[in-house]
Swiss-Prot record:
GO terms for biological process: monoatomic ion transmembrane transport; symbiont-mediated activation of host autophagy; viral process. It comes from Rotavirus B (isolate RVB/Human/China/ADRV/1982) (RV-B). This is Non-structural glycoprotein 4. The keyword Transit peptide does not apply. It is found in: Host rough endoplasmic reticulum membrane; Host membrane, Host caveola; Secreted. The chain crosses the membrane at residues 48-74. InterPro entries: Rotavirus_NSP4. Residues 1-47 are lumenal.
């Protein structure tokens, strides 16, 4: 039993020393190359085994962190950063593969190209032959409004002239009536008198006829 315990202690001591030796001797360049060229599965497995073994030996040896020198701490921190970087790269690669399979990247590139062409077309339209089209359009609209105002004023002046002309004609007709008007009125009055006499004669004749008819009925 004692021999088994000695073997375990020897193994732990060897593992602990090997891990510390590796952590102390490796540099950032080696860590970066190893992480960059290794698969995510291998990196995750190796990292977990290394950190697990180091933690186990520290607990068993009960030596705490006093053996973690500045270089070891720097390497451990850099290793963690590289693991995170590798994870980000792996996720990006997976996303790129999925997007490529669905041809999303090509569509996005096509949209970017179309947007660029539209922007170029808009610029060309706004600066046709070196002119600022927007400014030119505004000036044209302003000039057109001025022309419309001028036409409206001309129409107003023409209407005023026509109104004054009609007013003058009406005033002239009112101030100088025709000389034939009294004669025309006399003729109308004569017709009225003739109609009245005719009606009186007709009424008298009708009365005489009724008298004769009544006389016959009595006989």
């Amino acid at each position: 039993m004692a021999e088994s315990s000695d073997m375990q202690e020897l193994f732990v001591q060897a593992t602990y020393e090997e891990i510390l030796k590796l952590a102390s001797s490796v540099n950032h360049e080696q860590i970066r190359e190893t992480i960059s060229s290794s698969s995510p599965q291998k990196i995750l497995t190796g990292t977990m085994l290394t950190l697990g073994a180091l933690l186990t030996t520290l607990i068993v040896k009960k030596k705490g962190t006093k053996f973690l020198t500045t270089k070891v701490q720097s390497n451990v921190a850099y290793l963690a950063e590289m693991v995170v970087w590798k994870a980000n790269q792996t996720v990006k690669t997976i996303c790129d593969e999925v997007l490529h399979q669905r041809k999303v990247i090509e569509k996005l590139q096509c949209l970017d190209k179309m947007c660029s062409e539209i922007e170029k077309l808009r610029y060309d339209m706004e600066h046709f032959q070196g002119m600022d089209v927007t400014k030119e359009l505004i000036q044209m609209c302003e000039q057109k409004m001025i022309d419309i105002d001028s036409k409206v004023k001309e129409v107003e002046r023409s209407c005023d002239r026509r109104i004054r002309d009609y007013d003058w004609k009406i005033a002239t007709l009112t101030a100088h009536p025709t000389q034939q008007l009294p004669a025309h009125i006399d003729i109308i009055n004569q017709h009225i008198e003739d109609d009245a006499e005719t009606q009186i004669i007709q009424q008298h004749m009708n009365k005489q006829a009724r008298v004769k008819l009544n006389s016959r009925n009595r006989l």
